[in-house]
């Protein structure tokens, strides 16, 4: 089952495995106007969440640790991910979105990804 990503060693292998998982999952996930896709992008320092309507190709709402309300905030990266989850849920609800499809982007559902998802659920998004 090759997905066009070469296998390497060490950290490069982890990145390639994440890319393979993301490609595999994206074949089955798509956002619609009724249930857009909540995409989570994670780096070593920041986390970004976007609510995307794939049919129209538009981003309906977004939040990240680079937002001014979160950027200087206290706490570790998981606490900041919770703030991002609550903020993206608030902005999505303001845009008229009640339910989303969660796209973890090939990342494991643990740590910052899970913290963001739990905070978005608590703020009222359904997925």
From Swiss-Prot:
InterPro entries from the UniProt entry: Ribosomal_uL18_bac-type, Ribosomal_uL18_bac/euk
SUPFAM superfamilies for this protein: Translational machinery components
UniProt keywords, alphabetically: Ribonucleoprotein, Ribosomal protein, RNA-binding, rRNA-binding
GO cellular component terms attached to this protein's record: cytosolic large ribosomal subunit
UniProt key word S-adenosyl-L-methionine: no
One Pfam short name: Ribosomal_L18p
One of the GO biological process terms: translation
Molecular function per GO: 5S rRNA binding; structural constituent of ribosome
Family designation: Belongs to the universal ribosomal protein uL18 family.
NCBIfam families attached to this UniProt entry: L18_bact
Subunit: Part of the 50S ribosomal subunit; part of the 5S rRNA/L5/L18/L25 subcomplex. Contacts the 5S and 23S rRNAs.
Record function comment: This is one of the proteins that bind and probably mediate the attachment of the 5S RNA into the large ribosomal subunit, where it forms part of the central protuberance.
Name this protein carries in UniProt: Large ribosomal subunit protein uL18
Gene: rplR
